[in-house]
């Protein structure tokens, strides 16, 4: 006796089961799921894979999304603990990582996250040898270096989310201060995604008018308008959200999806993301930090040679030194 499906549907051609634009998110915590829902709502993928070691949490999050399939334009959502579920991904986003525990140093946390990357990355490489990888796990700059080393990928295919969110916060806060939409406020935060990040005040502008031409003291201690507090708020913004809601998720999820869109759509947009900067701006060590990079279907294809003041370049070098002092003691 024929099944309902056999009576209802007549197949004409065999289905092509290979996805054309598959994205994998590794880690289904708050950040991973914010990335996942942002990607789904933007319709960037024809298949989304979720990977996590916590199978109950993973299944629950996946089912929650699948139950909303009617409202999404992504036809296939898959999940699993094994990395074969991620096979043939165009883009893999790593959000999995350990959280700091009481009494632990940043180096201790970093070493634990290095161990996690050693467990994650080989499975990604084996199943998706041609993918691009975006690292979101903190400390993102050093872990981007770690993933690059473990993966053996060309440097342009291993991208840290870096200061893309810092720069977005920067532009939002400038816009709030000026009463202008942040898309019309142009400015960059470079260097470490963290306390030593560098605001490039010399380039901040609205409609091509640099704020420094209107206020030469902008961003300094002598500035009577206290613009320096804008960068302070950028640095403290994540901690502020963390203290109030226990974690950050939505802004970083949107930021990562913005990077994914530039890569998958080959938009050639410029983003401040983490990449290898050895040999540039006086940096001699094999350090990864954020500089403005062109993102397209090959990953990072170019970077912009930013005109900085001597002070800004000095701060960028100091940021690199901060990262190197942690990175040099790593055991890979």
Curated annotation (Swiss-Prot):
Cited InterPro entries: L-lactate/malate_DH, L-lactate_DH, L-lactate_DH_AS, Lactate/malate_DH_C, Lactate/malate_DH_N, Lactate_DH/Glyco_Ohase_4_C, NAD(P)-bd_dom_sf
Domain of life: Eukaryota
Keywords: Cytoplasm, NAD, Oxidoreductase
Record localization: Cytoplasm
Signal sequence bounds: none
Tissue expression summary: Expressed within the midpiece of sperm tail (at protein level).
Binding-site positions, substrate: 106, 138, 169, 248
Main location, first listed in the record: cytoplasm
Catalytic activity: (S)-lactate + NAD(+) = pyruvate + NADH + H(+)
Pathway(s) where this gene product acts: Fermentation; pyruvate fermentation to lactate; (S)-lactate from pyruvate: step 1/1
Gene Ontology cellular component annotations, sorted alphabetically: cilium; cytoplasm; cytosol; motile cilium
Keyword Chaperone tagged: no
Active site per database record: 193
GO molecular function, one term: L-lactate dehydrogenase activity
Coiled coil, from the record: none
Entry-annotated residues carrying Blocked amino end (Ser): 2
PROSITE patterns: L_LDH (PS00064)
Family: Belongs to the LDH/MDH superfamily. LDH family.
UniProt subunit comment: Homotetramer. Interacts with RABL2/RABL2A; binds preferentially to GTP-bound RABL2.
Name assigned to this protein: L-lactate dehydrogenase C chain
Organism: Mus musculus
Top-level taxonomy: Eukaryota, Metazoa, Chordata, Craniata, Vertebrata
């Amino acid at each position: 006796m024929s099944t309902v499906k056999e009576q209802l549907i007549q197949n004409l051609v065999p289905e092509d089961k290979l996805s054309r634009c598959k994205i994998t998110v590794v880690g289904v915590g708050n950040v991973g799921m914010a990335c996942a829902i942002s990607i789904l709502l933007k319709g960037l993928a024809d298949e989304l894979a979720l990977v996590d070691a916590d199978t109950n949490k993973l299944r629950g999050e996946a089912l929650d999304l699948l139950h909303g399939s009617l409202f999404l334009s992504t036809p296939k959502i898959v999940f699993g603990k094994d990395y074969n579920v991620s096979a043939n991904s165009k883009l893999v986003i790593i959000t999995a990582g350990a959280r700091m525990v009481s009494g632990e140093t940043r180096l201790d946390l970093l070493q634990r996250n290095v161990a996690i990357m050693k467990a994650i990355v080989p499975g990604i490489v084996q199943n998706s040898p041609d993918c691009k990888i975006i690292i979101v796990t903190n400390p993102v700059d050093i872990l981007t270096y770690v993933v690059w080393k473990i993966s053996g990928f060309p440097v342009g295919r291993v991208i840290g989310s870096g200061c893309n969110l810092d720069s977005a916060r920067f532009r939002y806060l400038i816009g709030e201060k000026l009463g202008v939409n942040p898309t019309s406020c142009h400015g960059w935060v470079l260097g470490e995604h963290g306390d030593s990040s560098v605001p490039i005040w010399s380039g901040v502008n609205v409609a091509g008018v640099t704020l420094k031409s209107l206020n030469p003291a902008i961003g300094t201690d002598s500035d009577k308008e206290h613009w320096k507090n804008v960068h302070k708020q950028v640095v403290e913004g994540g901690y502020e959200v963390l203290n109030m809601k226990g974690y950050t998720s939505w802004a970083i999820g949107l930021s990562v999806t913005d990077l994914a869109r530039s890569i998958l759509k080959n938009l050639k947009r410029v983003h401040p993301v983490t990449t290898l900067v050895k040999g540039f701006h006086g940096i001699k060590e094999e350090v990864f930090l954020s500089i403005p990079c062109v993102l397209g279907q090959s990953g990072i294809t170019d970077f912009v040679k930013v005109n900085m003041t001597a002070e800004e370049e000095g701060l960028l070098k100091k940021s690199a030194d901060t990262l190197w002092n942690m990175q040099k003691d790593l055991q890979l």
